[in-house]
Amino acid sequence: MLTMGLSIVSLARFQFAMTTVFHFFFVPFSIGMGFLVAIMETIYAVKKDKVYLDMAKFWGKIFLLSFAVGIVTGIIQEFQFGMNWSEYSRFMGDVFGAPLAIEALLAFFIESVFIGIWMFTWDRFKPGVHAFMIWMTSIGTMLSAIWILAANSFMQHPTGFRINNATGRIQLTDFGAVVANPQLWKVFPHVILAAFMTAGVVIAGMSAWGLLRKKSGENHFFKTSLRFGLWASLIFALASAGAGDLQTQQIIKDQPMKFAATEGIYEDTKDPAPWTVVELIDSKNHTASGKIELPGVLSLLAYHKLSGSVKGMNTINKELHAKYDKKFGKDMNYYVPPKTLFWSFRVMTGIDALIMLVAFVGLIFSRKKKDTIESHKWMLVVLGICLWVPFIANSAGWFITEFGRYPWIVYGLFTIADAVSPTSTVGTLLFSNIVYFLLFTLLGGVMIWYCRQTLHHGPYFEEADAKQNVDPFAKEAFGQ
């Protein structure tokens, strides 16, 4: 039974990870793309430069598909909550339901209404009014993110609640405290700025492939899009790194075990604390060896000063046992997965640095006065390949957030093992995992195929096709 129970928990966790990671491919992408398309259309409304109108229409197609796929994957994610985590839903429903209800009734309503108007009214409003529609859509996507992150931030740092001893459930006592949760206002800027960066990298990467095609009449469009995407990539990669630093300060305060794991620290560091570039982690014996360190750098990163030591996981584990043993027992394992967090952090920050470097070099090569980017095919290929890397960085950041909360599903209140549905079985979880994986593969394939087809047809395909359309009731429609 113990093995069966562990298998059920592992399979349920895998399904949650799979559905959330895949959903998170599209959420930052659609948020960022909507924002950048709004900027494009605003530039057109102000400058009347038609290339920005063409850009808004072309990249708007990519935004619409990512938005649609994000909705589908979000529905699947909510469905598996009820199927696999009913005890969690029962425990957290009073708190979790409020932000989700507001997200659906307010934010998603705004998105749905204005995205529909924006899609079908290109020639019915003045440019400024039409740009307002996509701005409202973009604001709606960001409002959705706030409410979802409010629920997740409660799971990381619970506020504004009490435990009903009769039912054993959380009850919401202060909605304002949930909204004002310091975790929320540290994680939200980091996520949103990373979303803008993601869209910028994708625009730059797809534009690079467009330039490599050398299709007549498209050079100006794709070069303008390329520089737009590169500027967005550079600016928002820098801003996202700064927001991530602020989030780190909150993690040190609320979840020291998570921070220690991201830095691979088992024993308390000396003062000042060195930053470990790479190391060999022995999670079984709770030790690390083969370290390559930069003296004093971790103190600067953690405390913004050249002094201060950092607690190790072994010390923090003892403190958590002293705090929670009376409630959860002495057999609890408070160590988070150190290898996952250590390398996820380095992948995330490494990719962010790579994007800054590539965007900076790309901007140099694509300067207006020196038309050299087309002659450096290697640079265009690098940019084209890099369009995938922000999705890896976003997933790595999600791994840090979720794996770093282990063994809690609601920090300090409810464990992952207690949250699984009592009716879940290995068979049903295996079946649903396979079905979801196949469905996600199909959705991902459709998204990639559509983006490729859109790029292949180019920005002026729709206009050329529209000229051939006729009134379905005109005589031309009947071949006369």
Predicted regions mapped to residue ranges:
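Polytopic transmembrane helical bundles with strong interfacial aromatic enrichment
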Residues: L2-Q480
